[in-house]
Amino acid sequence: MSTKEKLIDHVMKEEPIGSRNKVTVVGVGMVGMASAVSILLKDLCDELALVDVMEDKLKGEVMDLQHGGLFLKTHKIVGDKDYSVTANSRVVVVTAGARQQEGESRLNLVQRNVNIFKFIIPNIVKYSPNCILMVVSNPVDILTYVAWKLSGFPRHRVIGSGTNLDSARFRHIMGEKLHLHPSSCHGWIVGEHGDSSVPVWSGVNVAGVSLQTLNPKMGAEGDTENWKAVHKMVVDGAYEVIKLKGYTSWAIGMSVADLVESIVKNLHKVHPVSTLVKGMHGVKDEVFLSVPCVLGNSGLTDVIHMTLKPEEEKQLVKSAETLWGVQKELTL
């Protein structure tokens, strides 16, 4: 008899019940690993699968996470370059792609990443045909559109991480300015995740008090408090971090876990995420942009109708036109 047999008395054969909350992260770069760790620390899955083409890096990351298994509630952490390891995932987070270089615009990355997606997306669909697909790779709005097209999934099951992080950055800076916790500072950044994002100044509030009623020039020229600079700091935030440490990881990882939590726990929370906005706010083309959306079990269930000022709507349409200009040139 083996030690195990002497130690453990078998009462019944275990039923092979699959994972109920399996999450896959594709890409074990800085963003992928920060997302994976954030998901594990929030205890959001009963199985985590990691996939990457770089086998040694993947193997090392999986082992490193497994060695911390004692401190986690997720008992199964697996990884492979073969997508069969991702089978029956509930949520698949795609962070893989060419990394943004210092000074490179997110739009410049596009075709490099489209080619990578042509391999990744069909493999995800093959093994997890019912999953919710969350795209994080940049430029996220265009790549969410690409993932939607390549997957053949209905629109509610393809979500881009969008401006969830931009809005968090905005609320953080707003909190610094007002000496308040970010959760008490309400403000939404919508549109493109990137240079043409739109701050909805008309909705910025603390405890229901509209800041624009207190300061009618807020966000406009001639504002003595220069709130416009807050949005500029949001846009420049990623570039600044990349310049200083070479990449961004922690905040986007936490943002991803925040979105995954709303899905797997069916929270019906509202997040600014990237979805198909054709027909909304005067957008005529098939583009994905961030608007406030409700996330739950089935993915993206509802979109909130924002009351935008004409100027804000104009910026959103301009954003959409920029993205469409790039999208129509893509070879899918």
Swiss-Prot record:
Pathway: Fermentation; pyruvate fermentation to lactate; (S)-lactate from pyruvate: step 1/1. Substrate binds at R106, N138, R169, T248. Its EC number is 1.1.1.27. NAD(+) binds at residues 29-57, 99, 138. Pfam families: Ldh_1_C, Ldh_1_N. Keywords: Cytoplasm, NAD, Oxidoreductase. GO terms for cellular component: cytoplasm. One of its GO terms (molecular function) is L-lactate dehydrogenase activity. One of its GO terms (biological process) is lactate metabolic process. Its main location: cytoplasm. Disulfide bonds: none annotated. It catalyses: (S)-lactate + NAD(+) = pyruvate + NADH + H(+). Belongs to the LDH/MDH superfamily. LDH family. Interconverts simultaneously and stereospecifically pyruvate and lactate with concomitant interconversion of NADH and NAD(+). Homotetramer. PANTHER family: L-2-HYDROXYCARBOXYLATE DEHYDROGENASE (NAD(P)(+)), L-LACTATE DEHYDROGENASE A CHAIN. This is L-lactate dehydrogenase A chain. The lineage of its organism: Eukaryota, Metazoa, Chordata, Craniata, Vertebrata. The gene is ldha.
